[in-house]
Amino acid sequence: MAAHRIRATTNNNTSLPRCKSEGTLIDLSEGVSEASLTDVKVPSPSALRLDATASFGAAREVVAIKDCCPSSFTTLKFSKGDRLYVLDSSGAEWWYAHNNTEMGYIPAAYVEPINYRDSSFSDSGMIDTVGDCNEEAAKEMDLLGEWAGVILKPTTFQNGNPFAATNSSTNPFLNGGPQSPLDQNSNEKSVDLLLFDTLAPSVPNSTSITADINGFGSGVLNMNPLSPTVGVGQTLRRDNPFFRSKRSYSLSELSILQAQSDAPQASTGFFGGLKAPAPEQFQSREDFRTAWLTHRKLARSCHDLDSLGQNPGWGQTQPVETNIVCRLDSSGGAVQLPDANISIHIPEGHVAPGDTQQISIKALLDPPLELNNDRCTTVSPVVEIKLSNMEIRTTVTLEMKVSVVVKIESRQTTEILCVRSDCKEGPYTPIPQAYIYGDMVQVCLDNLEPCMYVCVVAQSKSIAPDSTVWEHVVKKITLGVYGPKHIHPSFKTVVAMFGHDCAPKTLLVSEVGKQAQAVPPVALQLWGKHQFVLSRPQDLRVGVYSNMANYEVKASEQARVVRGFQVKLGKVSRLVYVIASRNADDVSDFTLRIQIKDDQDCILAQFCVQTPTPPPKAGPKTSVQRRFLKKKEVGKIVLSPLAITTKYPVFQDRRINNLKFGKLIKTVIRQTKNQYLLEYKKGDFVALLSEEKIRLKGQLWTKEWYIGYYQGRLGFVHAKNVLVVGKVKPIYFSGPDLTTSLFLEQILKPCKFLTYIYASVRTILMENIGNWRAFADSLGYINLPLTHFCRAELDSEPERVASVLEKLKEDCNNTESKERKSFQKELLTALLKMDCQGLVARLVMDFVLLTTAVELAGRWRELAEKLAKVSRQQMDAYEAPHRDKSGVVDSEAMWKPAYDFLVTWAAQIGDSYRDVIQELHMGLDKMKNPITKRWKHLTGTLILVNCMDALRSSAFSPAAQDDCAI
């Protein structure tokens, strides 16, 4: 529907409902604040009835006498001569109509009635016959099944108003008017908003059934089983354009369908006992209103758990399209697509002073077939741009990030193009005003249309018969791992593969099992993403493995295949994995390892993601989260021992071969020495650990850097000073070979300068390490008995791990030892040798946040303003718990509010430890006299977190899932 397409807007005022049956919560006594419509009252979605005879059958047929180009997304687009059906003509200038496909507002002056039997259109009760519906299309989109035994009963209108329901006494948001008693017959069979409430069998003798469209009985849909041979399904399917053209259905619609089915099944879902509140249960109107709102909020975030994979992990139903709608005036501005490197820049004076323009941007994940073939491949999502006001004076600029680089030897035959079309499926034509700098494409859009589609492609002018454009470019593929908001004893996760770098925060998944077609799609949240280079379209095997013995991926689903033709077409591939807990009583977050292999069984990429936590347990909650344990509490930590002892792979000390090399085109000698920034000579060669560029401030400016290995040292090298030459090792490459042991030693240099809290480290290790013997061996305590670490016999594995950690702490703090060890470095070295990459990432991020808080101390307010624009009141709130009796925070305790802020800020950034450390470094660089000038070890941690994947892929042989942990 045109009037109900907007899923998310940046407008701070009231937003439109997401679907017609979710209802609009409006208190008429308080008035309605203006949204995106100017002086146009949007009828309640409950008025968009499913009653064909009283709603769509009660429409007045009109013909368009002018073309209408929508100035708003609530306006229906039509051309001269189109037939429309007016549902509400009560407005003087705007009427509400549909065209058998969409609904929206139309200007009354642009249409005229088919006949002039009635000169006035103010009476919306006048009924004309609706045109014939497309029977074949209705049958193709038949997702409802048959409703036997009931037919629709026309609804009587009050005062000729089709939008006023007869039974409105149960609506807590309608003030005024007589409150008639509840219809007792309507209570014989209630349909709750929740799809999975237990439903009683249909009663064929009931005289009236009230279906709840917007959350409570409104009398909008009355159904009487007058004839067992006539079904409502046919009427709804053929006469209701929503049920003929919609791709998904809301919970309220599905509730009606399930309530009227012949053999409804009683649900035993996780939330099966949750019922909608009844008015008679409350003493006052306000109490009922509050309870109804609470129930509605919960109901809209839940699905029938039995029909969605038999587990409580599939309960998120938020909108998933990555889009934004914004209104700009003549001052211009920029519109940024959320969670994507796509933006539109509007110059000043784009529209006349006093005018506004509504701009919509949407990233379409699946590209059209036209843009993916042997000679062409998409390297960005298709961007849909919609403009409302076409009386414009200037052009607009679109900027987006691409995931491709043309090889040097192919730059004469292959190029990066920006193409556009007025239709999603094409045809697409190149845009001449396109500029490429690095991985960003900037294109100037003129000849603007109300709806445009723009995409960036890599195209070869001429290729050999057996080759493709993939052989001439370096293209990156993005993997996103999606799952529920909270994990449960049994849940499903989805690995999605995209042909570009845009992985949305939520992903719509509809095929979650052998379900009925009427089951709505499910929106899953992004847990983590990873990019890797793919040389050609080929079959890819994607494996998912758990690091905890308590969780296991179904053996038959550990490795799924993405076919090469899917990769070539650029379509989004969704791979579903079932993950279950061996012990349902012991549920905690854990780490997933995702491994991608090619058709030759070689590992192309592998990475780790941290799962969310289980849902919070009911109980008293403290107002302030405590992040530090008292000494007395350390021994009282409740542990969850693993079901079995975990086995770990063996660290292999060998040469790292999968490297790219670059030629240095400039000599750099630094006046201010930095052990993490390389010095080099022009003409030498450097080994590159990753093609990913990292933004970092140099001596004066923020630049892009590679992580390089040069003459035995690991560090950053300015990307503009390197000419990438390929994977073949140059003859004149100097310095020792890079081995996994040397690599490990180099990346852990900054660790001994990081601050830590021992109690926190102890707790994390006890919860995540499942084999004390492997932990001790990796620390160098090879073949030592347990009595070497503790006197008493310990029963649980976590306590044994804690005793080994205590021994390490004693050895590192021993002043009599000839070789002084660093506790942090020894610990992280052991964990990386055990392949506990996710655990290392978590510890490093904790160390970095704590160290930054200690180094900043009283200057944390300046950083808070740079990172998150924190107000003075919020800063005072962070310091309040740490003030002494005189109301002042001691200088030695100033690190505590700084740490509280950094932990809160990091949680808002997301689960990517790389992004957190990168953004923190950028924020520190923006400070006056930044601490990174004297404390350079945060730069070293950037090298560490960006090199762990390369170390892992070289140091460990592929192993069976049962023999591997992270």
Curated annotation (Swiss-Prot):
Pfam families: DEATH_SH3BP4 (PF24094), SH3_1 (PF00018), SH3_2 (PF07653), SH3BP4_C (PF23637), UPA_SH3BP4 (PF23640), ZU5 (PF00791). GO terms for molecular function: GDP-dissociation inhibitor activity. It is found in: Membrane, Clathrin-coated pit; Cytoplasmic vesicle, Clathrin-coated vesicle; Nucleus. Residues 322-457 form the ZU5 domain. Residues 57-116, 657-727 form the SH3 domain. One of its GO terms (biological process) is endocytosis. Keywords: Coated pit, Cytoplasmic vesicle, Endocytosis, Membrane, Nucleus, Repeat, SH3 domain. The keyword Repeat applies. One of its GO terms (cellular component) is cytoplasm. Possible role in regulating endocytosis of the transferrin receptor at the plasma membrane. Alternatively, may function as a negative regulator of the amino acid-induced TOR signaling by inhibiting the formation of active Rag GTPase complexes. Preferentially binds inactive Rag GTPase complexes and prevents their interaction with the mTORC1 complex inhibiting its relocalization to lysosomes and its activation. Thereby, may indirectly regulate cell growth, proliferation and autophagy. PANTHER family: SH3 DOMAIN-BINDING PROTEIN 4, SH3 DOMAIN-CONTAINING PROTEIN. The SH3 domain mediates localization to the clathrin-coated pits and vesicles. Homodimer or homooligomer. This is SH3 domain-binding protein 4.
